[in-house]
Curated annotation (Swiss-Prot):
Membrane topology (UniProt): Single-pass type II membrane protein
Pathway: Protein modification; protein glycosylation
GO biological process terms, semicolon-separated: oligosaccharide biosynthetic process; protein N-linked glycosylation; protein N-linked glycosylation via asparagine
Lineage of producing organism: Eukaryota, Metazoa, Chordata, Craniata, Vertebrata
Full protein name: Alpha-1,6-mannosyl-glycoprotein 2-beta-N-acetylglucosaminyltransferase
Length: 446
C-alpha cells in the first residue's frame, strides 16, 4: 500500500514537472519570437552606443559583425547569418518608412503649409561637430524661419538625430539615402568580401575570380565603397527631393544644396533673394546660382554688393549651388552620362555634363563676397586634422569685422566672364558597372 502511494506521488510529481517545463518552454519560445518580430531598440552606432531622446526616431543599430578585409577572403558567398540579416533588414525598413512618411516638423498646419522661394538640402554623413556649426550659423541667419531645411543622411546616428531634433527655428524634414554602406555593410553598394582589392592588377583579379574583376576604373583600380557613396548619395538626393518629397510636389522655387561642413553668413537668405531677382531681370541666360566660393576676401568693403556672371566650374562653384526645377530637369536627362562617367566626384561629373550632355555650358551668378563658407578643412580630400572650432572662429571673425557691409540694399553685376571650358580630367573611382546601374536606377525607384 505504501509503495502504491509513493508511486502515485512520483507520477503526479512527474506530470507537474513536465507541465511546468512545457509552460516555461512555450513562454521562452513566444518571447524569442516576439523579440525577433519587434524592432530592436538598440544604440544607433554599433561601436560607441548612445541613448535615444524622447520624441526622437527609434535608435536602431545595424548590428553587423564585420568580417576583416585585411585577410584573404574566400571567393564564395559568406555563410548566412539570419540574426544579422534580420537586424539589417529592420534598419532598411525603418529608413524606407521614414522616407515614405516624410514627417515635417516646426510648421503649424502640415496639411496646408507650403515652402516659399527657397529650400535648403543638406547632405549629412557622420561629422556631428561640423553639422553643429552649420546649425548654429543657420540659427543666426535672418529670415531662416521661412526656409524649409531638408537633411539627407547616409549614416544613422543618435547624436546627429538629436542635433536636428534641437532645430526649432525653421521647418525641418529628414530623409535617408537607402543604399548606404551602413545599410549594406557586407555587400554592394557597401564592400562585399568577394570584391577585388583596389590595387589588384586586372589579370590577377580575373584569375582570382573576384566578382568585379572585369570592371576596374580608367586607372586600373577597383571600387572603394567609401568613395563611391558620396556620388550615389548626391544623385539620389537630387532626384528624391525634386520628385518624391511630397511638400515640394508643386514647388516652383529654388533648392540650395549644402553639405554638413558648410557655414552660412547671416545675410545669405537676404542676398539669395536679391540675386534671384537680379538673375530674372538682368541675366536670364544664367543657369544656376552659387552663394559660395573659395576666394579669400578679407574686406567686404566695395564688393559686398557685387556679383559676377561666370562659366560654372566645379572647383569654384560647387558650394551653395542653387537649382531651379528647369535646371534639375535638364540634369536628370543626363542620367546615363552622369552615372557612367568615370569620376567618383559628383561635382567633377557635373563639370563633364556641362561640356558633353547639357544643351550648353552653365553660366553661374556668384557674389564676389561668399555667403556660404567651407568650414571642413579635413575630410575625403584632405589629410589634415579636423579643427572645426578653429575654422568656425576664423569665419566668425571675418563676418564680425565686416558686418557693416552685409545686407546690401541692392546688387549689381560687376563683370561677365563666360567661355566654354575644356572637358575636365577624370579622376576615376567609378568604373564598376554595379555603380553605374544603381545610379541609373534612382529615377525608377519610389
Amino acid at each position: 500500500m505504501r509503495f502504491r502511494i509513493y508511486k502515485r506521488k512520483v507520477l503526479i510529481l512527474t506530470f507537474v514537472v513536465a507541465a511546468c517545463g512545457f509552460v516555461l518552454w512555450s513562454s521562452n519560445g513566444r518571447q524569442r519570437k516576439n523579440e525577433a518580430l519587434a524592432p530592436p531598440l538598440l544604440d544607433a552606432e554599433p561601436v560607441r552606443g548612445a541613448g535615444a531622446r524622447a520624441g526622437d526616431h527609434p535608435a536602431i543599430s545595424v548590428g553587423i559583425r564585420r568580417g576583416s578585409n585585411d585577410s584573404a577572403a574566400p571567393l564564395v558567398a559568406a555563410a548566412p547569418q539570419p540574426e544579422v540579416d534580420n537586424l539589417t533588414l529592420r534598419y532598411r525598413s525603418l529608413v524606407y518608412q521614414l522616407n515614405f512618411d516624410q514627417t515635417l516638423r516646426n510648421v503649424d498646419k502640415v496639411s496646408s503649409w507650403v515652402p516659399r522661394e527657397l529650400v535648403l538640402v543638406v547632405q549629412v554623413h557622420n561629422r556631428a561637430e561640423y553639422l553643429k556649426l552649420l546649425l548654429d550659423s543657420l540659427r543666426k541667419a535672418q529670415g531662416i524661419d521661412n526656409v524649409l531645411v531638408i537633411f539627407s543622411h547616409d549614416f544613422w546616428s543618435t547624436e546627429i538625430n538629436q542635433l536636428i531634433a534641437g532645430v526649432d527655428f525653421c521647418p525641418v524634414l529628414q530623409v535617408f539615402f537607402p543604399f548606404s554602406i551602413q545599410l549594406y555593410p557586407n555587400e554592394f553598394p557597401g564592400t562585399d568580401p568577394r570584391d577585388c582589392p583596389r590595387d589588384l592588377e586586372k589579370n590577377a583579379a580575373l584569375k582570382m575570380g573576384c566578382i568585379n574583376a572585369e570592371y576596374p576604373d580608367s586607372f586600373g583600380h577597383y571600387r572603394e565603397a567609401k568613395f563611391s557613396q558620396t556620388k550615389h548619395h548626391w544623385w539620389w538626393k537630387l532626384h528624391f527631393v525634386w520628385e518624391r518629397v511630397k511638400v515640394l510636389r508643386d514647388y516652383a522655387g529654388l533648392i540650395l544644396f549644402l553639405e554638413e561642413d558648410h557655414y552660412v553668413a547671416p545675410d545669405f537668405y537676404h542676398v539669395f533673394k536679391k540675386m534671384w531677382n537680379l538673375k530674372q531681370q538682368e541675366c536670364p541666360e544664367c543657369d544656376v546660382l552659387s552663394l559660395g566660393t573659395y576666394t579669400t576676401v578679407r574686406s567686404f568693403r566695395d564688393v559686398a554688393d557685387k556679383v559676377d556672371v561666370k562659366t560654372w566650374k566645379s572647383t569654384e562653384h560647387n558650394m551653395g549651388l542653387a537649382l531651379t526645377r528647369d535646371a534639375y530637369q535638364k540634369l536628370i536627362e543626363c542620367t546615363d552620362t552622369f552615372c557612367t562617367y568615370d569620376d567618383y566626384n559628383w561635382d567633377w561629373t557635373l563639370q563633364y555634363l556641362t561640356v558633353s550632355c547639357l544643351p550648353k555650358f552653365w553660366k553661374v551668378l556668384v557674389p564676389q563676397v561668399p555667403r556660404i563658407f567651407h568650414a571642413g578643412d579635413c575630410g575625403m580630400h584632405h589629410k589634415k586634422t579636423c579643427r572645426p572650432s578653429t575654422q568656425s572662429a576664423q569665419i566668425e571673425s571675418l563676418l564680425n569685422s565686416n558686418k557693416q557691409y552685409m545686407f546690401p540694399e541692392t546688387l549689381t553685376i560687376s563683370e561677365k566672364l563666360t567661355a566654354a571650358l575644356s572637358p575636365p580630367r577624370k579622376n576615376g573611382g567609378w568604373g564598376d558597372i554595379r555603380d553605374h546601374e544603381l545610379c541609373k536606377s534612382y529615377r525608377r525607384l519610389q
